Amino acid sequence: MDTPDKNARVLYDYRQTINDLLINHYSIRWQHWAAKQGKGIRNQAHGSPANILDLYAVSDVPEIEGRDLVSIKAAPSVAHTEGKKLSSSESATWLDEHFQSNLGDVKKALDLFFLGGVNHIFYHGTCFSPQEAPWPGWLFYAAVHFHPNNPFWEDFKYLNQYVTRVQSFLQDGTPDNDVLLYYNIADVMSEQGNRSLQHFSGLIVICWNLRSEKVR
């Protein structure tokens, strides 16, 4: 008999199967292969149709991006609970239109990552450009350009000194969190909608939690 409960269970089984395949037959194999080469992997798990916390846990360095503090905390939270030394961020990808962001804008974005627990900053926006290319050189979609053709290049070192000092303390310190929020992945995977697969981020699941509490 077709019932909401049975439909939810079938949907959960399908999504859990995809989850297991992505973790066991892709992410773990990738990490093992890298380890055999003496390397580690850095992975942005958010957006995957699987439990992103488990995917982050497979990575040697969980990596996050974005501007929402709740979402930013997803990767560092896994690093804290799994005993990983580093959690990184794809930083300052798109803060304004091309060449309109200044180092103050970049620092503001980096401080949000630090507040979320990130302790290993990666700049996003360094594009290869031949020396003979006319100014401003080769560009790509990311609007903050960390290269010598940007007028802030001469002062970039001062921001890096700040980043080095802050993240060195964060890397040497010990996380101290008062609250551990349950990630109710089973409930989310059972929810029916217009998509067979759901692509998860920390913010989406937190919002689902809040909505469920209101319904109850």
Question: Model segments located where?
Answer:
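Carbohydrate-binding surfaces of carbohydrate-active enzymes
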Residues: M1-R216
